[in-house]
Amino acid sequence: KHFAVHPECYAMGPDGKRRGVRNARSQICYTNPETYRLVLEALKGFVEADRKECPDDPPLVYDFTQQDNAEFLCLCPDCRREIARYDRGDGHAQGGDAGLQLAFVNRLARDIRATYPDVIIRTFAYNSTECAPKPGTISVEPNVRIWWCDLYSRSDHTVPLETSGHFNAARAQTLKDWLALTDNVEIWDYMLYDATYPEVSVRAIARDIGLLASGHVRAVFVEAEYTDQPFYELNTYLQ
């Protein structure tokens, strides 16, 4: 909709070019002032329309987050400088992108709260934004909710997250880093996503749900729709 008029509002890739939303990996430019103006204007329009359509029971949670299947947000010089502020030292995917997105979302949350104090802005911690920003660099507004995604490609869902000596322990720490930053966290989990594995996640489910509950996670959404998994009905019941 906006690329022809405002290409500067779209993410710059490592090749220095900006691409529109028809490109699967295209994002927005998070530091461009016009980007923010357009997003805030659209958000206010959605909220106002919903209040008119459903005055007695309007939606309260609005999602703003990155596009799927992207390895970075924006690599323009201004965004790179912001990324460096929040980076834990291992690249943009180690807190830098999360900080870049969270700063943008925090601003949205503050501005929308002035008119609609009951509205919550939800944003993903996923792919390049899955790791929390460097401690002490940013806070989370009270009307911002983090939706942390436990990527099935980065953990073993047949083993509990908190398993000493297992690579899942690093995933558990990533979640704990977010919970140290805010208690307004939801989970998008897969439990056991692939259809081809002769494995069962039953033992892991109970311990993982216990971990999430003890961490004061607000809600859990489980994506595990392949019906030819072993013990599919039991897994679904437990989830």
Predicted region positions:
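Catalytic-core regions of glycoside hydrolase
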Residues: 1-33, 37, 41-239
